[in-house]
């Protein structure tokens, strides 16, 4: 009797573990936003900041990401943007929000002569309002839409 139960339960356990396990290591949209767009610990004073960060944050694997923006504010302040002014996203969606005040950002743009795998970026420090797409409950940033 015990062996029969084991023979029934074991395949079921294998199915459940096989189904749940891949989702444990999967990067959520909010996690990807943080990896791509948040650098609270830095103010990017180095002209090589973008070259270093784009590589470190895995945005130069397989190809050079043409443009990226890093926000140099606390995660709490960036999350707070999701409760600020609702604006239309560049793609027409209505889940974007604009920060009330200008935030410290670094704009990274691929230089014209740069070719993969040698991705070279121009680093530009700015103070601008940010626009982020937010999702979930509680609402958190999932995409950097623009700066203004």
Swiss-Prot record:
Signal peptide (from-to): 1-25
Compartment annotation: Secreted
UniProt xrefs under CDD domains: RNase_A_canonical
Main subcellular location: secreted
Tissue expr: Pancreas.
Biological processes, Gene Ontology terms: defense response to Gram-positive bacterium
Highest taxon of source: Eukaryota
Reaction(s) the record says it catalyses: an [RNA] containing cytidine + H2O = an [RNA]-3'-cytidine-3'-phosphate + a 5'-hydroxy-ribonucleotide-3'-[RNA]; an [RNA] containing uridine + H2O = an [RNA]-3'-uridine-3'-phosphate + a 5'-hydroxy-ribonucleotide-3'-[RNA]
GO CC, alphabetical: extracellular region
Catalytic residues (positions): 143
Name of the top EC class for this enzyme: lyase
GO molecular function: lyase activity; nucleic acid binding; ribonuclease A activity
Binding site for substrate: 32, 35, 65-69, 90, 109
Recorded coiled-coil stretches: none
Keywords: Disulfide bond, Endonuclease, Hydrolase, Lyase, Nuclease, Secreted, Signal
Enzyme Commission code: 4.6.1.18
Disulphide bonds in the chain: 50-108, 64-119, 82-134, 89-96
Family classification: Belongs to the pancreatic ribonuclease family.
Subunit organization: Monomer. Interacts with and forms tight 1:1 complexes with RNH1. Dimerization of two such complexes may occur. Interaction with RNH1 inhibits this protein.
Functional description taken from the UniProt entry: Endonuclease that catalyzes the cleavage of RNA on the 3' side of pyrimidine nucleotides. Acts on single-stranded and double-stranded RNA.
Protein name: Ribonuclease pancreatic
Organism: Peromyscus leucopus (White-footed mouse)
């Amino acid at each position: 009797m015990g062996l029969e139960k084991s023979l029934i339960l074991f395949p079921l356990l294998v199915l459940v573990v096989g189904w749940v396990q891949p989702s444990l290591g999967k990067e959520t949209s909010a996690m990807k936003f943080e990896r791509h767009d948040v650098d609270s610990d830095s103010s990017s004073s180095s002209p090589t900041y973008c070259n270093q960060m784009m590589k470190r944050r895995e945005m130069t694997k397989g190809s050079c990401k043409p443009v990226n923006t890093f926000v140099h504010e606390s995660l709490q302040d960036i999350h707070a943007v999701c409760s600020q002014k609702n604006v239309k996203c560049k793609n027409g969606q209505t889940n974007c929000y604009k920060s009330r005040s200008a935030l410290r950002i670094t704009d990274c743009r691929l230089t014209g002569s740069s070719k993969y795998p040698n991705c070279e970026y121009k680093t530009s420090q700015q103070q601008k309002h940010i626009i982020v797409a937010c999702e979930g409950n509680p609402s958190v940033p999932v995409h950097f839409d623009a700066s203004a």
